[in-house]
A protein has these predicted regions:
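Acidic (Asp/Glu-rich) sequence patches and key acidic residues
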Residues: 1-142
């Protein structure tokens, strides 16, 4: 599972590709469409961002930490779900500015180090699924 973030009013320089009409999702037509869609998204920053749920949650927590004066607790809570919650263009502009500053001044790197340190220091818990080895090897993954 992952989180998908779409820009509501992104500045684009190219036209978004049209979806094929056929239902054969394994066809070369669909393959070409997805290639073109990836190109479009890479060329038009702000149209789409995706992250798996394990990386999205800490990222969104960090965004909230930097922006808790412009984001509500409801924004924070709903930002952890795939509910389609929207924030304003003004909020997005402030978030972008602050994230860029935090990346440039090293604050994000420090946050990352602290996050990984916290993960390393989590207590071990008994796991009946993997029997404590950290890898699942049952009928669901074989």
């Amino acid at each position: 599972m992952g989180m998908d973030v779409y820009g509501l009013n992104p500045q684009t320089t190219t036209e978004r590709p049209k979806r094929p009409n056929n239902k054969d999702y394994q066809s070369e037509e669909w393959d070409r469409y997805f290639e073109k869609l990836n190109e479009y998204q890479n060329e038009n920053v702000g149209t789409y961002f995706r992250n798996n749920v394990w990386w999205w949650r800490p990222l969104w927590d960090y965004v909230y930490q930097l922006n808790d004066d412009i984001l509500t607790e409801e924004d924070h809570e709903l930002g952890h779900s795939n509910s389609g919650h929207e924030i304003t263009e003004a909020q997005c502009e402030v978030i972008c500015k602050r994230l860029t500053e935090a990346l440039d001044n090293g604050e994000t790197e420090e946050y990352k180090k602290g996050y990984y340190l916290a993960l390393e220091n989590l207590p071990l818990v008994k796991c009946d699924t993997c029997e404590g080895v950290g890898e699942r090897n049952d009928q669901y993954v074989q």
